[in-house]
Amino acid sequence: WQPPWYCKEPVRIGSCKKQFSSFYFKWTAKKCLPFLFSGCGGNANRFQTIGECRKKCLGK
């Protein structure tokens, strides 16, 4: 099993001023971590729940 390409992308908070609780996959640590997404911009390494992050990037 191979994780999707976006699991290897660095976290990007985006360029707006809002704060949404989100999770990203930290490739070097092989785990999902919380961060605050600004509401726009960013990248595909962003998940609404830790469960979604783990499912997509760890296959669990």
Curated annotation (Swiss-Prot):
Reported tissue expression: Expressed by the venom gland.
InterPro entries documented for this protein: Kunitz_BPTI, Kunitz_BPTI_sf, Prtase_inh_Kunz-CS, TFPI/VKTCI-like
Disulfide pairings: 7-57, 16-40, 32-53
One GO term describing the cellular component: extracellular space
BPTI/Kunitz inhibitor domain location: 7-57
CDD domains listed in its UniProt record: Kunitz_dendrotoxin
Localization per record: Secreted
A Pfam family hit: Kunitz_BPTI
Similarity comment: family membership: Belongs to the venom Kunitz-type family.
Protein's job: Potent blocker of high-voltage-activated calcium ion channels in the nanomolar range, particularly the L-type channels in cerebellar granule cells. The sensitivity of L-, N- and P-type channels to CAC is tissue and species-dependent. Blocks the L-type current of cardiac cells, depressing cardiac contractility.
Protein name: Kunitz-type serine protease inhibitor homolog calcicludine
